[in-house]
Structure formats: C-alpha cells, structure tokens
C-alpha cells in the first residue's frame, strides 16, 4: 500500500474554500460547467500533443468526457482522458493558487459579501474549487500523459488539508468523484445532470456522456466554415437554440478577428410573438466563450430592440466566468455589442437589396423593433434609419419605400420630408391634409403605427431634410398669393368678421381661426401646434378622456360653398349658425382622426335635424 501524504492548503486556498463551503449560492449547479470545461481543456491539450507528434500515453483512448451519477452512493463522477496531472501538478494546481492575482481574487470574493456570484470563482482559473459547493468530500485520481508517469489519488474535505497517494493501474486523464452534501443529492440524479449539461455544455468540442447516452449531440455550428454547413444543419440548429418548431426567416453567420475575435450565428424567426399578445420577448442571444456557455439570454450582448434575434455569440477574448455584474460594465462586452449589432444591421441592409421579398416579410413582422431602435439607439440610429420602410402617396398599397428612396425623388424646391399618420391608407387619402401636397406633387409618407410619429419626432431629420407632419400648422406650403379675390366667396372684411365670429363660437377649442392656403376641396381643417394628431389620439386613449384635446388652429376654405352658406346664416343671426359652426369643427376633428365624444355630437346632430326638418 502506498504512503499517504497529508498537506496543508495554501492560505489563500483555505480562505477560498471557507467562502465556498459556507456560502449559499443560488446557481451552484454551475460547478458542473466548470468541471466539464476543465475536462475539455485537458482533452484539447492532449489532442494538440498528438497532432504535434509527441509521445503520449494511451494513444488509443478516445477523447471524451464521461459523467456518472450514482443515486445510491450519492456521488457524481466526471472523468476525462485528457492531459492528466503528475504529483507536482496536483500540488501546484490544486494545493496553491499559482499566480500573482490569487490574493486579489480571494479579497474580491470576500468583499462581495451577500452578493457573491459563483461566476467569480472561475475568473481566476480556480473553477475546480466550485466542486465544494455541492460536495463535502472530493476524490480525484489522475495520471499524466507522460509515458512513464505514475498515477495519483488526491482527496480533501475542503477543511484545510488534502492527501496525496500513489494509485496503480490508472488510464491517462483525470477522474473527479464528488461525495455530495445532503442538500445536493439531486446532482446524483441522471436527469438533473443531463439538464445542466444541455444548458451549459451542449457545445463543448468533445463528446459528453451520461452513462452511455451522448448528451451534446448538436454541433457548435458557429465555429465551422459556413461553406461546410448544410441548410438542414442550420435549420436543426435554429430549432435547438431557439426552442422552435418552425424554420427561421433569415440567418447571419460571420466570424471576425478585428476589432475583436468572435464568431456569431444569429437567426430571425418567422413570427413576432409580441404581436400575438405573449408579452415582451426575452433576449434570445446566448453568450459563449470557447463553446462554453457564459450567459444564457444575455441582455447586454445586443441592444434591447434586437431581442427578437435568436442565436449565439462566442468570443475567446472573454474571461470564461465573467460575472453578471462585470457584464454590465465591461468595455469588452460593449465592444462585442457594437460589433455584433453593426454587422447585423449591415446584414439586414444587404437582405433589403438582394432579397427584397424576404426583407419585406421581415419588415411586416418586426418593423416595430427597428422603429424602437431608431428612436432609442443613438449609436446605431443612422444604420437603422436606412432600413425603415413605408407606403406613400406615390406608391401602391403594400408597396414600400425607404427614406433614401423618398429623398432621391424629392421635387425641386421641396425642403422637407412630409408624413401623415392614420389608421388606414383609405382614411388618410380621403382626409383634407393631402390636398396641398397633391397640388404641388409632393410625396407624403403614410404611417399607420402610433410609434411612427414618436420615431420621427425623435430623429427629426434624415439626410439633412427635416421630417414634418402634414397636419402641422407651420408648413409654409401655400403659394404666396393664395386664392384670388374672384375665387373667394367672401370679401376680406367679411372673412375677418367670419373668422372672429367662429373663434368666439368655438372658444377655447381653438387658438386661432384663419384662412387656409392649403385646402382645395374641403371646407375646414384642424392643424396642430405641438406634436401630431396621432400623438394626441394616443394621449386621449392613455388618459381615457375624450375631452382632453389640445386647442389647435382651425383653417377655413373661403372658396367653399359651405363656408359661404354658414356666413350667410351668421349675418342673418340665425340660431342654426352656431350649431353648424360646432359641427363644422367636429367634422374637422374627425377628419384629423381626433377622437370626438359621440354623445355631445349626437345631441347636436339631433338639434340640427330638428331645425332642418321644420
């Protein structure tokens, strides 16, 4: 029987183990990720040695990781055929923290207090000790790759010392057996172990078995050359990573060495689940380092508006166990975010040019996310604006143009980009706001979503051209001379008297009544001082107050026969005139899309009918 040596842990190790053993971690199952990652690293080192022609013990051993849960013994064993360790390696790698940052690491872990994050343990290359979160004893056997190396057994309860003894007839590699704590017996159950492996270690580059079942059956496609991957493989990978049953609409697969080393494989689903009332989508991009999961549904790796994307970002430059706190403040994460987002936006721009029908399908499903990004993402705003698409007065129904298309065909002398919001194309085109634009042959963008006006208000201009709503009061679109005296049915004096009377009748509902130089066929129009009418509608609905309508400008068309007839009634001091004036204003509100209280209008219409039918 070989002699058993007992050694004391280095001071920093004792401090580390004390913190690990006596702390409660909410995500302690991460220990298995650490041990599998160590096994994969050990296997990679042996593979490199074999490729470089070095003499390696047990050349025929397959490079695989075998995990054996034993519910009866309450143990969990992780075994690899990797590089293994000599006696010196065991003392150096496990008995001490063999680098200058050890004291700083232990100090940081101690200072974390109640907010300790298990991820900190792996940041300094000491992930092995996470085993003591779930085990009250760890037994390790190991044999180095060196042909004449002796095998050794290492054991510890994590209380301050460890033992080393020789072990005969060991294969190359390392086997770690965890004798599980009473509150950690679930880790001896095969189903629990399989779930953890699938969550954290699905893509390690070596087979991982639980019993005889291979768990990591899906390849890490993002690390492969895209020319070597079939369409079917991409589809199956998407279904796995997105937990989806359908096929993706689009995918982007790219690798980059500068400004940061990364591999990314992102998919766009076919459906926007937020549209169906399933609530706000969670982030869908997982962050990996060397095929090992760092964070599932990483919120910081892409902007909030890109939450519809599904896939993987993998960077070897990340610390394997970057903590959640560090994620939020890391300059490296910020750089990853910027690179991935810019590449994805370029990908969408390429799709718009090369696959317009697919991009149109994407736009119909996910336009709301790009609009959210245009309003809130200052870093990528200009890239996003190129992707926005709208119908217009110069397109057919369902035909979309970009802001760039609009600017490219602006009329000579046109100073701004004009847009109008309404529930449907028909309602917009039947309203009075397009009349002056039709006369001038100016194109007007049609927007149908409430967020559109908010987006345009936030971005304010595109390509040096202001974005102006067609219902704004200060557009300066009319010809200088306006309507000729012959065309007007009212003299200048009568017009002033009529406007003053109308202002008096309507009171605080309007700030001003004036002659319109933009109307052709309609008798009156309401223009907005602030914001747009669609934003006013939103405020009315949010406040649940149909009376909460900001006073606007009422413009009248002195060429219209209705205005002439109303003026005649005014001059006759007919009691019908104020009722008609109120209804004229209500009609203009309805044309503007402003929600009118129907009860007051019905009462007024009944009175109008009563007088008309006498």
Curated annotation (Swiss-Prot):
Residues 325-537 are annotated as: B. Pfam families: HATPase_c_3 (PF13589), HSP90 (PF00183). Keywords: ATP-binding, Chaperone, Cytoplasm, Nucleotide-binding, Stress response. PROSITE patterns: HSP90. One of its GO terms (cellular component) is cytoplasm. Molecular chaperone. Has ATPase activity. Belongs to the heat shock protein 90 family. This is Chaperone protein HtpG.
């Amino acid at each position: 029987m070989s002699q058993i040596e007992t050694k004391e842990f280095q001071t920093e190790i004792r401090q580390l183990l004390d913190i690990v053993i006596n702390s409660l971690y909410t995500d302690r199952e991460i220990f298995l990720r650490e041990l599998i990652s160590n096994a994969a690293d050990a296997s990679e080192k042996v593979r490199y040695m074999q490729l470089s022609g070095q003499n390696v013990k047990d050349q025929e051993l397959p490079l695989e990781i075998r995990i054996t849960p034993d519910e009866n013994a309450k143990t969990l064993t992780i075994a690899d055929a990797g590089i293994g360790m000599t006696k010196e390696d065991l003392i150096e790698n496990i008995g001490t923290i063999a680098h200058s940052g050890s004291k700083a690491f232990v100090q940081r872990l101690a200072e974390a207090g109640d907010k300790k994050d298990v991820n900190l343990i792996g940041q300094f290359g000491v992930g092995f000790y996470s085993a003591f979160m779930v085990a009250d004893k760890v037994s390790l056997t190991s044999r180095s790759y060196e042909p004449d190396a002796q095998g050794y057994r290492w054991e510890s309860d994590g209380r301050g010392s460890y033992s080393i003894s020789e072990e005969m007839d060991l294969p190359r590699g390392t086997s770690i057996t965890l004798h599980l704590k009473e509150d950690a017996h679930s880790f001896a159950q095969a189903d629990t172990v399989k779930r953890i492996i699938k969550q954290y270690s699905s893509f390690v580059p070596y087979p991982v078995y639980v019993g005889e079942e291979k768990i990591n059956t899906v390849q890490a496609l993002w690390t492969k050359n895209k020319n070597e991957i079939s369409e079917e493989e991409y589809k199956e990978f998407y279904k796995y990573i997105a937990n989806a049953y359908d096929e993706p609409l689009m995918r982007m697969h790219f690798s980059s060495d500068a400004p940061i080393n990364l591999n990314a494989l992102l998919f766009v689903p076919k459906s926007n689940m937020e549209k169906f009332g399933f609530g706000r989508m969670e982030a869908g991009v997982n962050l990996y380092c060397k095929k090992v999961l760092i964070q599932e549904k990483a919120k910081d790796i892409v902007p909030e508006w890109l939450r519809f994307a599904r896939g993987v970002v993998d960077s070897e430059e990340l610390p394997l166990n970057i903590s959640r706190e560090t994620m939020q403040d890391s300059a490296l994460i910020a750089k990853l975010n910027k690179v991935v987002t810019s590449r994805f936006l370029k990908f969408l721009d390429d799709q718009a040019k090369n696959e317009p029908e697919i991009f149109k399908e994407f736009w119909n499903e996910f336009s709301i996310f790009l609009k959210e990004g245009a309003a809130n993402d200052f870093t990528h705003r200009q890239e996003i604006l190129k992707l926005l698409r709208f119908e217009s007065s110069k397109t057919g129904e369902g035909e979309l143009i970009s802001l760039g298309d609009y600017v490219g065909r602006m009329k000579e002398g046109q100073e701004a980009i004009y847009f109008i919001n309404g529930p449907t194309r028909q309602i917009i085109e039947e309203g009075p706001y397009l009349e002056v634009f039709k006369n001038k042959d100016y194109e007007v963008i049609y927007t149908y979503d409430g967020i559109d006006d908010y987006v345009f208000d936030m971005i304010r201009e595109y390509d040096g051209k202001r974005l102006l709503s067609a219902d704004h009061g200060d557009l300066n679109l009319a010809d200088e001379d306006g309507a000729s005296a012959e065309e007007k049915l009212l003299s200048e004096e009568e017009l002033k008297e009529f406007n003053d009377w109308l202002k008096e009748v309507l009171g605080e509902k309007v700030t001003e009544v004036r002659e319109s130089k933009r109307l052709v066929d309609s008798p009156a129009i309401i223009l907005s001082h602030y914001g747009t009418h669609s934003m006013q509608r939103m405020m009315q609905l949010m406040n649940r107050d149909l009376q909460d309508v900001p006073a606007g400008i009422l413009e009248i068309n002195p060429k219209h026969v209705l205005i002439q007839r109303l003026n005649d009634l005014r001059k006759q001091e007919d009691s019908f005139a104020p009722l008609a004036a109120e209804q004229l204003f209500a009609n203009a509100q309805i044309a503007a899309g402003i929600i009118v209280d129907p009860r007051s209008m019905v009462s007024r219409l009944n009175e109008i009918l009563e007088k008309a039918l006498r």
